[in-house]
From Swiss-Prot:
Keywords: ATP-binding, Calcium, Calcium transport, Cell membrane, Ion transport, Magnesium, Membrane, Metal-binding, Nucleotide-binding, Phosphoprotein, Translocase, Transmembrane, Transmembrane helix, Transport, Vacuole. CDD domains: P-type_ATPase_Ca_PMCA-like (cd02081). It catalyses: Ca(2+)(in) + ATP + H2O = Ca(2+)(out) + ADP + phosphate + H(+). GO terms for cellular component: contractile vacuolar membrane; intracellular membrane-bounded organelle; membrane; pathogen-containing vacuole; plasma membrane. This is Calcium-transporting ATPase PAT1. Mg(2+) binds at D678, D682. It comes from Dictyostelium discoideum (Social amoeba). It is found in: Contractile vacuole membrane; Cell membrane. Belongs to the cation transport ATPase (P-type) (TC 3.A.3) family. Type IIB subfamily. It comes from the Eukaryota. The gene is patA.
């Protein structure tokens, strides 16, 4: 023992010598207030990297060594310990703590005591069996249920681990590489880009315009720019904060539980909450439980007095032995409550979610939010990104125009002047964050933005070495790309002066230019060729190519302060056309969505023409569909927006704010919205949507953190699979609910009525007079319920755990996407489900009561004569009742596999091996239960012919189920509730919005409703008080219309008014000029204007159409 202590001491001393900086000291760097003094004491960046055995240029070594092992031993791993999960024994204790089960256990113990002593039992040698059997049944039910819960928890933990495992960019052994977030160590060099969530504490090494949002940590609302202390800047990077601008590198100083975020997360761990459906079903289970409790209490209030009254009427003395029957009645009542409480409902949800999530993960959907599994099935619209989701995100430059040439890539280096090549390649290399490195697949390739990777590959055609360019050019200032700016610029030192390189959306870059490079590489005024470049942009866009504009400008030192990007009067280098092939499976996936009643909208930053062509190729843009650009969309008023949304299919040149506005307004209109996003600024839209899908490959960490589901392959088809699984999970719950409620009603009713109608005294007299010596005639009629506590507990196990396992694991079928989505306000139990529940319950009760009251006569014809008569209410009689009851449930479980009017419950039957296994297991246990249970299960062995009869009786539920499903029934149309408060974030409309925001070309179809003849809004009226005859102009444009075309003043839709006219409540006055529609005011009248060319019209504020009076037109 002493030797081991000495060895441990030596190892600690060795680590202290190798890594002299303690964990506590490193932690002080990012504590509040931040440790500037500690940083200085450690020797700043160089001193700290030396003490941590790291190199700020080459990072940690790739080779394993004792130093690296000691590093992990001292500073820990970047992994938080798993939250303490509930062990199996704890789950068992939780299950046993149920008040109803405790009552049942207490009653069973009392039954054992009373049944095993002479004082209270006629047969003490066997009187204890019932109580012990109940205890064994309770243990089995609790054990199987708890084991199931334990396995579900393990599945969720496994998925959670997978969702947390991400890769970050770093430098090791002098090479840029991808590092698992769990493998990040103290001393690592990590690269940071806009949108990253910092994975560990660290200090700034170098970078440009790196700003972090630390508001959730320090309370500082403004972004904090990072740099070196000597520049009076903050060098400390805190784990959990977000990079909102710029890029850079950092030296890791703390990981895992020692990092700032690790300490915070360890203190904030809370248990996961139930999903909305779980909570809804828990409430339903409680209500059903109250019904069972009421039935049990009522049964006791009737049965116990009845027992004593019967004894008194027949002059039978009441003795101490009567305590045992009373206890059995109490046990029966408690068992009714146990059976009535459908604990399986929340269990079925958990099981369906666990099973569905595991299967979805295999199909490239990583679920981060459990509730989203339920919501996905109700999605009515999908707002999808284009790049990487609808397309393959495998980009390559295929054409373009530089210096007026470059139709193809062949011999391009010979077609473009050398000095222009130098400008072009310098700009593509330095104005980029992409780099060549080893990918997660082990391949050497460009890593980063796919657009930038395509440009770097294009630069290779000119012999460009991007590393040489980046070493040669010194960056002075960086102006990062943003979805709002649609461009990125970098300012570098160049020949004693400065040069700005800019790239971005081609039409935006072109608009910033004052000159261009001609075929010889000379600078010429842009006015000479602007029309040509615009034509080329449209040509490339018509071929579904992304167009990127490239430009530059030279500056003198001191020409401006460069705090704001000087992106004006640029020299236009040219345009490159980038091809991003459509994913081959997308058109079919879009068509599936249409059949499923889901509207697909494309929201993209590309220009309108490119977006239209891609959308048309996907099948998203259809005849009569609308396309619009983001800046125009955000200028629409709420009523105008509501008018175009039903037909809006493409939103081009959109910003994240436009996407958020679109999602919010769709939700306001009652839609269940799924949205995709990959950028940092997509976070609000992803959070706002009912289901947010982030990109697992191209998505930023901020987008992933804000999403509900991560698309591991960035593929639109995976969204369709997620919707399929969402519907399947919902259907699985409905199937189980349909099955369980039927069993509940039947079991409780049979136990309740059977107990109340049994006449023990008469049965005893009958049995004693029979005088037969065989085994059945020697038995006595049984007191109380025809279904004993042990039998009901077995039924409870069948209908709770086993049925949940069988029905919750049904695989999805294509038919799920052949119907409209379930409304988010749709009832959990539909009319067709009630039809099946009530119909099956009525059938089963009719059969069981027939067997209960006449079964001893009916089955007498099927047993050998040697058996003797079947005693009414005897052991054999009640065994037949119990066996028929179980077989009715087995066959009804097959019925429950289908919902609605579908006829064939055996379709895809063999596609679910779990269902088949459960059926075989249940059948096998039932045979053992009846044949060998004896006194423990209160059963008597049956003859083969009786088994056949029970199977035939149970199978009756199949044709009856078919007939029930054939009965037509109309489901009520559930209207989605329109929220009182809008979730959309509206920007203030421009005072002069373009007319194309509101009106399409003359051929467009109207898409909005006429004004109402009654209700909150009234139509305009003339001076005599009569309503004006109105007609409606169209709103929006079809896919083939040019929505940017202004409406000429000579349009036949425009009218003039010859005198003031009153306007009804709820209408607006709108002035139509030759170019614009302007809301004048909210007054009650409008008139002909003095100004020429101006016309007033009226518009319903809550309608999307314009109503123009036609009975007062100047001819």
């Amino acid at each position: 023992m002493t030797g081991s202590h000495e060895m441990e001491s030596i190892m600690l001393d060795s680590m202290e010598e190798e890594f002299p900086v303690s964990v506590e000291t490193l932690g002080k760097l990012v504590d509040v207030p931040k440790g500037f003094d500690t940083y200085a004491e450690l020797g700043g960046l160089s001193g700290l990297s030396t003490k941590l055995k790291s190199n700020i240029k080459t990072g940690l070594p790739l080779e394993k060594s004792s130093t690296e092992e000691n590093r992990v031993l001292k500073y820990s791993k970047n992994i938080l310990p798993d939250p303490p999960h509930q062990p199996l024994w704890s789950i068992v204790l939780d299950a046993l703590s149920d008040h109803i089960l405790i009552l049942l256990i207490v009653a069973a113990v009392v039954s054992i005591v009373l049944g095993s002593i002479d004082y209270t039992s006629d047969h003490p040698e066997t009187g204890w069996i019932d109580g012990v059997a109940i205890l064994v049944a309770v243990i089995l039910v609790v054990g199987i249920t708890s084991l199931n819960d334990f396995k579900n928890q393990a599945r969720f933990r496994e998925l959670n681990d997978k969702s947390n495992d991400k890769e970050v960019k770093g430098i090791r052994g002098g090479e840029q590489c991808q590092i698992s977030i769990f493998d990040v160590k103290v001393g690592d060099i990590i690269s940071l880009d806009t949108g990253d969530i910092i994975c560990a504490d660290g200090v700034f090494i170098e970078g440009h315009a790196l700003k972090c949002d630390e508001s959730s940590i320090t309370g500082e609302s403004d972004p904090i720019k990072k740099g070196q202390p000597q520049d009076n800047m903050d060098p400390f990077l805190i784990s959990g904060s977000m990079v909102i601008e710029g890029f850079g590198t950092m030296l890791v100083t703390a990981v895992g539980v020692n990092s700032f975020n690790g300490k915070t997360m360890m203190g904030l761990r809370v248990a996961s909450e139930d999903t909305p459906l779980q909570m809804k079903l828990s409430v339903l289970a409680s209500r059903i439980g109250y019904f069972g409790m009421g039935a049990a209490i009522l049964m006791l209030l009737i049965a116990i007095p009845k027992y004593f009254i019967q004894r008194k009427v027949h002059d039978i003395e009441i003795t101490r032995e009567d305590a045992q029957p009373i206890v059995q009645l109490v046990i029966s009542a408690i068992t009714i409550v146990v059976v009535a409480v459908p604990e399986g409902l929340p269990l079925a949800v958990t099981m369906a979610l666990a099973y569905g999530m595991m299967k979805m993960f295999k199909e490239n959907n990583l679920v981060r939010n459990l509730a989203s599994c339920e919501t996905m099935g109700s999605a009515t619209t999908i707002c999808s990104d284009k790049t990487g989701t609808l397309t393959q995100n495998v980009m390559s430059v295929v054409t373009g125009t530089i210096c007026g040439v470059f139709p193809t890539l062949d011999g391009i280096a010979q077609k473009i002047p050398k000095h222009v090549q130098s400008i072009l390649t310098d700009g593509m290399a330095i104005n980029s964050n992409a780099y060549e490195g080893v990918s997660s697949k082990g391949k050497l390739e460009f890593i980063g933005s796919k657009t930038e990777c395509a440009l770097l590959n294009f630069g290779k055609l000119f012999g460009c070495d991007y590393n040489e360019v980046r070493k040669r050019l010194e960056v002075v200032e960086l102006y990062p790309f943003s979805s709002a700016r649609k461009r990125m610029s970098v300012l570098v030192k160049h020949d004693q002066n400065l040069r700005l390189f800019t790239k971005g959306a081609s039409e935006i870059i072109l608009g910033q230019c004052g000159s261009y490079l001609d075929e010889a590489g000379n600078i010429r005024p842009i006015s000479e060729a602007k029309a040509y470049f615009e034509e080329q942009i449209n040509n490339f866009a018509s071929d579904a190519l992304r167009t990127i504009g490239l430009a530059y400008r030279d500056f003198q030192y001191g020409e401006c302060d460069f705090k704001e990007p000087p992106e004006n009067n640029l020299v236009f280098i040219g345009i490159v056309g980038i091809k991003d092939p459509l994913r081959p499976e997308v058109p079919e996936a879009v068509e599936i969505c249409k059949r499923a009643g889901i509207v697909v909208r494309m929201v993209t930053g590309d220009n309108l023409v490119t977006a239209q062509n891609i959308a048309r190729n996907c099948g998203i843009l259809t005849e009569g569909g609308l396309c619009m650009e983001g800046p125009k969309f955000r200028e629409l008023s709420q009523s105008e927006m509501d008018a175009i949304l039903p037909k809006l299919q493409v939103l081009a040149r959109s910003s994240p704010t436009d996407k958020q506005l679109l999602v919010g307004r769709l939700k306001d209109l009652g839609e269940v919205v799924a949205v995709t996003g990959d950028g940092t600024n997509d976070g609000p839209a992803l959070k706002l949507a009912n289901v947010g899908f982030s990109m697992g490959i191209s998505g930023t960490e901020v987008a992933i953190a804000a999403s509900d589901v991560v698309l591991l392959d960035d593929n639109f088809a995976s969204i369709v699979r997620a919707v399929l699984w969402g519907r399947n999970i919902y259907d699985a719950i409905c199937k189980f609910l349909q099955f369980q409620l039927t069993v509940n009603v039947v079991a409780v009713t049979v136990a309740f009525i059977g107990t109340l109608t049994s006449d023990v005294v008469e049965d005893k007299d009958n049995s004693s007079s029979s005088g037969s010596a065989d085994k059945v005639t020697e038995e006595e009629p049984r007191q109380g319920s025809p279904l004993t506590a042990v039998q009901l507990l077995w039924v409870n196990l069948i209908m709770d755990t086993l049925a949940a396992l069988a029905l919750a694991t049904e695989p999805p079928t294509p038919e799920l996407l052949e119907r409209p989505p379930n409304g988010k306000n749709a009832p959990l139990i539909t009319r067709s489900m009630w039809k099946n529940i009530i119909g099956q319950a009525a059938l089963q009760l009719a059969i069981l009561f027939t067997i209960l009251y006449q079964g001893h006569n009916i089955f007498q014809h099927f047993v050998p004569q040697a058996h003797g008569p079947i005693i009414k209410n005897g052991l054999h009689h009640y065994t037949l009742v119990f066996n028929c009851f179980v077989f009715l449930q087995l066959f009804n479980e097959i019925n429950a596999r289908v919902l609605g009017s579908r006829t064939n419950p055996f379709k895809n039957f063999f596609n679910n091996p779990i269902f088949i296994a459960v059926m075989i297991f249940t059948l096998g246990v039932q045979i053992i239960f009846v044949t060998f249970g004896g006194s423990a299960t209160s059963t008597d062995s049956l003859y083969i012919v009786e088994w056949i009869c029970c199977v035939v009786v149970g199978a009756i539920s199949l044709p009856v189920g078919l007939l029930l499903r054939k009965i037509p029934i109309r489901e009520p149309v559930v209207k989605n509730e329109i929220p009182v408060h809008s979730e959309a974030v509206y920007t203030s409309p421009s005072p002069n919005p373009s007319s194309s925001n509101l009106l399409g070309s003359g051929g467009a179809k109207p898409i909005s409703k006429d004004y109402p003849t009654s209700g909150e809004s009234t139509p305009p009226i003339n001076d005599e008080g009569s309503p004006l005859v109105t007609r409606k102009t169209s709103v929006g444009a079809s896919a083939n219309d040019n929505i940017n075309t202004p409406i000429p003043s000579s349009s036949s839709n425009l009218v003039n008014l010859n005198k003031p006219t009153q306007v009804g409540r709820g209408w607006q006055i709108v002035r139509q000029t030759h170019k614009k529609l302007v809301v004048i005011n909210a007054l009650k009248e409008f008139s002909q204007n003095k100004e020429p060319g101006l016309v007033d019209v009226v518009r319903g504020t809550n309608r999307g159409s314009l109503h123009l009076p036609v009975n007062q037109i100047n001819n």
